[in-house]
Amino acid sequence: RGKTQDSYNAGYFIFNGDGEMTGIPYLHDYGRGSGPIGLTNTNSVGVVRDAIGEWQFKKFGSGNPIDFSFGLPTVAETWDGFLNDINGYHVKKGDVFEAIDGAVSGSLAEGNVGGGTGMMCYYFKGGTGTSSRTVEVGGKKYTVGVLVQANFGILRDLVIAGVPVGKEITDLEPVEKPQQDGSIIVVVGTDAPLSPSQLNLVAKRATLGI
């Protein structure tokens, strides 16, 4: 959640797949983002985008008839229809407002929260995960933080602490043919003074982490 309406440098990279993500044309042409970034399920992209825009307008709107406080919100999705009644369209604007207004600095809630609530990972319960590092460049320290919404993976590929545990628990394999596809969203944030083109490269490097 931004403390001001100021936009920020931004980039993106699509590694594979056909997931929906709003705001890409603006990121591509201008290399700028504005307002909160939303992560949700496939069927809730529209309501989350509209709610973020409404939140920005109410918080930063000037009252001018030509007011662009709405911005062009960035919202991405993964499909959670296996665990969630996705066609019930249960995510409402109020849920988005609550999430934005409840955002705080410091440690983040992980696992079964937010957009990650209905997600799967390596046939187990997936969700939201984070990681961060501080780096020093030219005598100055910067933070690089990563948040993922994980919804992918097949059991036999599950590795924990270097141990291929997925190959040892094959009795948990489903009876039906295993689903081969999946999805993941990676959001990287930093206070380092990077340009949009550099941030595109940062986004591309996130695929190595996957």
Regions found by a protein language model. Give the residues of each.
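Alpha/propeptide regions of enzymes that mature by internal proteolysis
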Residues: 1-210
